[in-house]
A protein has these predicted regions:
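Conserved beta-strand positions in the Rossmann-like core of class I SAM-dependent methyltransferases
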Residues: 16
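Conserved Rossmann-fold NAD(P)-dependent oxidoreductase catalytic core, especially the SDR/UDP-sugar
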Residues: 22, 77-120, 134, 142
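Conserved small/polar residues in nucleotide/adenosyl-binding loops
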Residues: 198-200
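Conserved beta-loop-beta element that borders a ligand/cofactor-binding pocket
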Residues: 130-152
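NAD(P)H-binding glycine-rich loop region in Rossmannoid oxidoreductase-like domains
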Residues: 23-86, 193
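Conserved catalytic-site region of short-chain dehydrogenase/reductase
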Residues: 64, 98-103, 149-153
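N-terminal Rossmann NAD(P)H-binding glycine-rich loop of SDR-like oxidoreductase domains
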Residues: 1-11
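Substrate-positioning beta->alpha
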Residues: 124, 172-186
Length: 200
């Protein structure tokens, strides 16, 4: 969330950040308002979202949360519903690479080399996208899937955009920095080039 927030503020956007832990937001900016709430506090989500041009969701119950699978599938529909009730027309979601194809008919989340400790989080977000989000027709939504590996690095502004297949380099590796992912997310917010799934 930090990199996307910084990218938004650096481009002059007015942002309301909704976070569980206020300590997660260290930025100080006149265009930033911080609201403390849990994703299940739907009344707060709705009120904070009213009048906004778009909502960007980076919700994750926590990779170490033993209930990440159940909470992702339970809570993400609450976010979608809150956005609709707030009257916001666009929802951009920090997606996962799990539903991308690394080979014909084979999704990343079904690969044998996915670490077991990450599988519940990867599968739950993938299932939310496949079984729930793709059926959503009342708002414009984007599920922005990152590369298979997303790590802190540099903001280069250089990346490739794909659709259903994992984007890899000449060596077959799939990487992007969190900084460049934030650039892609805010670019999409501003330019409205795509509908539904895109990935970088």
């Amino acid at each position: 969330i930090r990199d996307s927030l910084n990218e938004l503020l650096n481009r002059g956007h007015k942002v309301t950040a909704i976070v569980r832990d206020l300590a997660k937001v260290t930025a100080s900016n006149p265009n930033l308002k911080v609201v403390q709430a849990d994703v299940t506090d739907t009344d707060v989500l709705i009120e904070a979202s009213k009048g906004k041009d778009a909502v960007i969701s980076a919700y994750n119950p926590g990779w170490k949360n033993p209930n990440i699978y159940e909470e992702t599938l339970k809570n993400y529909p609450l976010i979608v519903d809150s956005v609709k009730k707030a009257g916001v027309e666009r929802l951009l979601i920090v997606g996962g690479a799990g539903t991308l194809f690394y080979a014909p008919g084979k999704m990343v989340m079904d690969a044998d080399d996915v670490p077991a400790k990450l599988l519940p989080g990867i599968k739950s977000l993938g299932e939310f996208y496949l079984n729930t989000l793709r059926k959503e027709n009342d708002i414009d939504w984007i599920f922005l899937s990152p590369a298979a590996n997303m790590t802190p690095g540099e903001r280069t502004g250089k990346f490739r955009i794909g659709k259903d297949d994992l984007v890899v380099d000449v060596n077959g590796d799939s990487n992007i920095s969190v900084e460049d992912y934030a650039v892609a997310m805010v670019d999409e917010l501003e330019q409205k080039k795509h509908l539904s799934l895109i990935h970088i």
